[in-house]
Amino acid sequence: MFQFVKKKNEFLKFARLGSRAFTQNAQKTHSKGSNIALVSSSLLSVGMIALYYNVYGPSLSAGTPKEEGLHFIQHDWPQSKVLSGFDHASLRRGFQVYREVCSACHSLNLIAWRHLVGVTHTADEAKQMASEVEYEDGPDDEGNMFKRPGKLSDFLPPPYPNVEAARASNNGAAPPDLSCVVRGRHGGQDYIYSLLTGYTEPPAGVEVPDGMNFNPFFPGTQIAMARPLFDDAVEFEDGTPATTAQAAKDVVNFLHWASEPELDIRKKMGFQVITVLTILTALSMWYKRFKWTPIKNRKIFYQRPIK
């Protein structure tokens, strides 16, 4: 009887060992299969991304400076700093440059007279400038269109009535709208400034066709737009010397504001958000320590009851 029980215990022990070994082998096999599946799916994902980028990704080409244009010169713009905004005196001068020079060919379709209030001009000055422009309105009670003086709600008038008229007046190339030109160009204000101040005589051996102008910062180095800025082309009311560089700087600042009129507001809001979040983070850390310090430092002792 004792031998039977002993053999039975040995059999159960052997069965337990076999079951444990089978379970471990199954876990290893499952883990190995999971790793293989994970590696396969990762390789498949990387391959699909590489295939998509190869088919639809941008093509790289090594262009010469003549084909791509010279790299723009980087400048220190106040609005590009974290804690500073637009120079409003420069914005006022820049609007004057746009109005007296650039508006002859380029439009600002997204800027209304009311947008200038508090930025470049007072409300009375903006109303006065708007009233000097006649806008077509209507129809009246008889169904006829009529002309009226401009209001603050009107947008700045375009130089041409439509795109076709713009093309016809510029040898088939319509001048672009300048509302978002700074944000829509690689290099932003640095590129626009370099382009405006980069007009020069072509080097020896370079032929420029009629109707084209040489500018090394423009792709292809030949641009249809003639040089727009010259020294003393405008007369600033604040007495600032109207050099080509100064006029280009001011008009680029104004065009940057036209592309991002909410930039200063975003910076102020971001600074306020960071300040509030910093205070809330400090308060939450203090409250966490206030609540958890007694709990973490608490010691519990078991004292046996005295009989």
Swiss-Prot record:
Residue range of the transit peptide in the UniProt record, numbered on this chain: 1-56
Catalytic activity: a quinol + 2 Fe(III)-[cytochrome c](out) = a quinone + 2 Fe(II)-[cytochrome c](out) + 2 H(+)(out)
GO molecular function: heme binding; metal ion binding; ubiquinol-cytochrome-c reductase activity
Record's bilayer topology term: Single-pass membrane protein
Binding site for heme c: 102, 105-106, 225
Side Mitochondrial matrix, residues: 288-307
Named cofactor requirement(s): heme c
PROSITE patterns: CYTC
Major location category of this protein: mitochondrion
Subcellular location: Mitochondrion inner membrane
Membrane-spanning intervals of the chain: 270-287
Residues in Cytochrome c domain copies: 89-259
One Pfam family matching this protein: Cytochrom_C1
Alphabetical keyword list: Electron transport, Heme, Iron, Membrane, Metal-binding, Mitochondrion, Mitochondrion inner membrane, Respiratory chain, Transit peptide, Translocase, Transmembrane, Transmembrane helix, Transport
GO biological process: mitochondrial electron transport, ubiquinol to cytochrome c
EC number: 7.1.1.8
Its biological purpose: Component of the ubiquinol-cytochrome c oxidoreductase, a multisubunit transmembrane complex that is part of the mitochondrial electron transport chain which drives oxidative phosphorylation.
Family, as annotated: Belongs to the cytochrome c family.
Subunit comment: Component of the ubiquinol-cytochrome c oxidoreductase (cytochrome b-c1 complex, complex III, CIII), a multisubunit enzyme composed of 3 respiratory subunits cytochrome b, cytochrome c1 and Rieske protein, 2 core protein subunits, and additional low-molecular weight protein subunits. The complex exists as an obligatory dimer and forms supercomplexes (SCs) in the inner mitochondrial membrane with cytochrome c oxidase (complex IV, CIV).
Protein name: Cytochrome c1, heme protein, mitochondrial
Name of the encoding gene: cyt1
